Amino acid sequence: LPAAAIAADSTASATMHVSLEVVKSCTLKANDLNFSRHGSDESSEIQAKTQVDIVCTNGTPFTLTATSNDGENGTFWLKPENGDTGAQKIAWKLFADEGKQTQITGTNGLDDTGNGAEQEETLYGVIDAGALTTAQAGTYSDDITLKLEY
């Protein structure tokens, strides 16, 4: 046989499996909630709102809840920043809607489903009407923990 006939091009092939697992994940960014300034003669309900930014894997259901060291589920307490332990604390609550239908507590909260993009959710803080009547002058604050379960 001529040498040119033996040097023919040859090929081989194989199948390669490629895989990827996308796991569910979420991130949460919270902004501060500020009730602003009010006199102790404020007789109407006080509302303030803020946003939280949530990013969850597309199709991932999540629940946003809130807890505090105050020990009560759903009622949080603004405490004097000057450390006066004898001063009145001011009760407040957190809601997922302006109409106050969905309260955010340690066991119940805002339910939604992630879409893979940032979802801005508005939260509403509420102080009941007349709650400042016996409050001492000063700055009050509270720290709560927002938890995203998914």
Predicted regions and their residues:
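N-terminal small/polar-rich segments of proteins
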Residues: A7-D84, N108-Y150
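Residues that form or immediately flank small-molecule/cofactor binding pockets and catalytic motifs
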Residues: S40, D97-G99
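Predominantly extracellular/luminal cell-surface or secreted proteins
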Residues: T67-N69, K93-D97
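Extracellular/luminal ectodomains and secreted, surface-exposed scaffolds of diverse proteins
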Residues: F76-W77, Q88-L94, T102
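Surface-exposed loop/edge segments in extracytoplasmic proteins
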Residues: K100-G106
